[in-house]
UniProtKB/Swiss-Prot annotation:
Annotated signal peptide: none
GO cellular component annotations of the record: cytoplasm
Keyword Nucleus annotated: no
GO biological process: peptide biosynthetic process
GO molecular function, one term: translation elongation factor activity
Organism, as annotated: Mycoplasma mobile (strain ATCC 43663 / 163K / NCTC 11711) (Mesomycoplasma mobile)
Name of this chain's protein: Elongation factor P
Coiled-coil regions listed in the entry: none
Localization of this protein: Cytoplasm
Length: 188
């Protein structure tokens, strides 16, 4: 059991036959009243993010999540195929569970799958990912007022705003949490 007073980012727990991961927890106590905890949580089965409220001292059942490192192999229509680095076993995961992550997955990318018992919940990808720009329009002269940006397309098909100096063929770093440009990558 996990005391809700100890909630912090990344803690996983079970409630109402669902598995949740804490994204953010806010603890508050008012005067003589009892403490309360508001937690922003992600349902690991559906991907839905909700806010749950608890009375200080409540307990929830801990969910023991296993993480396994795998490589992304390919997209097979309705599913993606991953391979276990240790056993070379291949598994398929429905794309509906990894819709956002698909924007950043390139062949051979290292990911972690999260398993509960024998059920695969979702995948975790690195926070910052290097991707190659495949389409970048030329910068327009005179378009240089406050923080000029242009829309580029990366190798996964994802489109994002970048500074004007980014050119086709360059490697850029993209945040997998926000989908925003973070900087130039290692252009070899």
């Amino acid at each position: 059991m996990v005391n809700v007073n100890n909630f912090k980012n990344g803690i996983t727990f079970q409630e109402e036959d669902e598995i949740f991961s804490v994204i953010e927890a806010q603890h508050s106590k008012q005067g003589r009243g009892q403490a309360s905890v508001k937690a922003k949580v992600k349902n690991l089965r559906t991907g839905a993010i909700t806010i749950k409220s608890y009375t200080g001292g409540d307990k929830v059942k801990k969910a023991h999540i296993e993480k396994i490192e795998m490589n992304f192999l390919y997209d097979e229509g309705e599913n993606i195929v991953l391979m276990d680095n240790a056993t070379y076993e291949q598994i398929s995961i429905p794309k509906t569970r990894v819709e956002w992550e698909m924007n950043f997955l390139v062949e051979g990318a290292k990911v972690h799958i999260r398993k509960f018992a024998d059920e695969i919940l979702d995948i975790e990808i690195p926070v910052n990912i290097e991707l190659k720009v495949i389409d970048a329009p030329e910068a327009v002269k005179g378009n240089t007022s406050s923080n000029p940006q242009k829309k580029v397309k990366v190798e996964t098909g994802f489109e994002l705003e970048t500074p004007l100096f980014i050119k086709e063929g360059e490697i850029i770093i993209v945040s997998s949490e926000t989908g925003k440009y973070m900087g130039k990558g290692n252009n070899k």
